[in-house]
Curated annotation (Swiss-Prot):
A Pfam family assignment: Uteroglobin
Protein name per UniProt: Prostatic steroid-binding protein C1
Family the UniProt entry places it in: Belongs to the secretoglobin family. Lipophilin subfamily.
Cellular component terms (Gene Ontology): extracellular space
Role played: Part of prostatein which is the major secretory glycoprotein of ventral prostate gland.
Localization terms from the record: Secreted
Record text on subunit structure and interactions: Prostatein is composed of three different peptides called C1, C2 and C3. These form covalent C1:C3 (F) and C2:C3 (S) heterodimers whose noncovalent association forms tetrameric (C1:C3/C3:C2) prostatein molecules.
UniProt KW keywords: Lipid-binding, Secreted, Signal, Steroid-binding
Other known facts: The heterodimer can bind non-polar steroids, cholesterol and a group of small proline-rich peptides.
Annotated PROSITE patterns: SCGB
PANTHER family named in the record: SECRETOGLOBIN FAMILY 1D, SECRETOGLOBIN FAMILY 1D MEMBER 4
Family matches, as SUPFAM superfamilies: Uteroglobin-like
Record carries keyword Secreted: yes
Length: 111
């Protein structure tokens, strides 16, 4: 069941990022949230969520999915994060990626 939740989350992120009407206007916060969710620790994510004063049940639900994601190897999470960065580049946030993830530059040569 947890894999289904993760798959659904990733599909929703892809749909939001690549929907034609929003392609050039993707919110940098969505990109940050997505990559942070994959790569940060549970503790870092919890601190970030506290800034939004979300209901405890919502925070716990997100952390539960995070625990599922954290069962993936770091290498697998990096592959997913890099794939999402590629999608963000295609959706017009190249400047954001260059600013916050300068180490991920190998995708520029793919265009």
């Amino acid at each position: 069941m947890s894999t289904i939740k993760l798959s659904l989350c990733l599909l929703i992120m892809l749909a939001v990022c690549c929907y034609e009407a929003n392609a050039s206007q993707i919110c940098e916060l969505v990109a940050h949230e997505t990559i942070s969710f994959l790569m940060k620790s549970e503790e870092e994510l919890k601190k970030e969520l506290e800034m939004y004063n979300a209901p405890p049940a919502a925070v716990e639900a997100k952390l539960e999915v995070k625990r599922c994601v954290d069962q993936m190897s770091n290498g697998d999470r990096l592959v997913v994060a890099e794939t999402l960065v590629y999608i963000f580049l295609e959706c017009g946030v190249k400047q954001w990626v260059e600013t916050y993830y300068p180490e991920i530059d190998f995708y520029y040569d793919m265009n």
